[in-house]
Amino acid sequence: MTAATGILSFGAYLPRNRLQRAAIHAANAWFAPGLAGLAKGERTIANWDEDTITMAVEAARDTLTGIDRSTVGALSLASTTLPFADRLNAGIVKEALTLPDAVSALDVTGSQRAGTSALIQALRAAAGGGAPQLCLAAELRKARPASDVELVYGDGAAGLLVGQGAPVARFLGSYSTTLDFIDHFRSRRADFDYTWEGRWIRDEGHMGLIGAALSAGLAALGVEGAAVDRFIVPLTARGVGDGLARKAGIAPAALVDPLAAKVGETGVAHPLLLLASALETARPGEKVLLVGFGQGVDILLFETTAALSALPPRRGVAGSLARGVKDDNYLRWLFHRGLLDLERGMRAEADQKQPATTLWRHRKTVLGLVGGRCTRTGTVQYPKSDISVSTNDHGVGTQEDYPLADVPATIVTYTADSLTYTPTPPNYYGAIDFDGGGRLMAEFTDVDADDVEVGRKVGMMFRIKSVDEQRDFIRYFWKAVPLG
């Protein structure tokens, strides 16, 4: 009997801060009063030290909850906002996750359906056997101030682990079309998307192209629209999902919430994010139909299984939504996105050059937060060194790798530094002790003044350490985030 192919696990990540759309409208109403119609709810916004890579790492960690990472055989990262044009972005994610060196990694880009297209390819490869494949999608798009999309977009990431075995959702098949329909585009030199007229996009693209693909796809898959229990349309434009459901004969109740009011449209990540959201509440035996749109259409059909109940708890979409903090500081967000040039002072002029030689030698220490544990005494330390720091046994060559990224820690000391430069002053940092041993002088992120205190439990998150603006190079490291 052939093993079933499908989704083995899923996860998600949404940034903590939620910019109120009313704040965006209030700042731009003098120039663009028409934004009032979009000024309800909130959208996710990444912190200054987040990008598609850091968000993908967090979504991957969530996806791999309870999974032996050594079993992962391939990794793909889909996004149209990857920070490096000629450096494997998925390779950085691989290092942060401490996946085996023998894993294959791939960046997928160029279209808003890059996430679903990468997922289809991974599922087809998995059907032929082999190790599970980790599919990640993340997006952090810039939007021109006072534009509609400034309120519509959101930042986020999602992950799916696919392979053979006992999937939580069996893959039943897919259908795809490719058409150079330009609803929007962004050239290599542009910071912002150029978007075409909304009604034409809705009528010709959403209702026309997706509608036709749904009809053909359902027929090719041998499924009636009425049999679909969860219908995922990753578009937040009002009425589009309902219209497509009616056109395909799918019950209106099957339409999955596109998270427009609380998240926004997270681009390439949105189909996978909504799929993760649907799986969080799905029951066994439900048929889930997923749409991807961008210069064509992807249609994917899944059927959930009883394995859903066996998944260990995870943050997921629901947990990410629950940790949100309302934010109405529009100017700060513009500054973090590089759209507002503030006087930063001489301390911001320090050269942040990263020697590639040093990063290569210490990639596990820096990107993977891998410390060392003495095999004779059990003493844990960070960083790992040739000589153990054990009090009574300074053994040489006795340490083994000891990953610390998923180990909780406790704040021992801290300071709020208003002199050093940081895009979110003051700069919080201090000493933390990991459970079971190991101490690190860490920066704190996603914190307010009341969040940092001695004895507070923290976890670690992969973030941007600094940006070498002279060479346009991003340095990554791990930062502490309060738990609870």
How would you name each of these model-derived features?
Residues 348-410:
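Cys/His-rich short segments
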Residues 461-484:
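OB-fold/S1-family single-stranded nucleic acid-binding modules
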Residues 446-460:
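Short nucleic-acid-contacting surface segments enriched for D/E, G, S/T with interspersed K/R
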Residues 419-431, 475:
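Short aromatic-glycine-enriched beta-strand elements
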Residues 57, 81-82, 100-102, 107-130, ...:
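Claisen-condensing/thiolase-fold acyl-transfer catalytic domains that form or cleave C-C bonds
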Residues 59-73, 211-229, 248:
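Phosphate/pyrophosphate-binding loops at sites that engage ATP/ADP/AMP, CoA/4′-phosphopantetheine
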Residues 429-435, 443, 479-480:
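Short, acidic/hydrophobic/Gly-rich beta-strand patch recurrent on exposed beta strands
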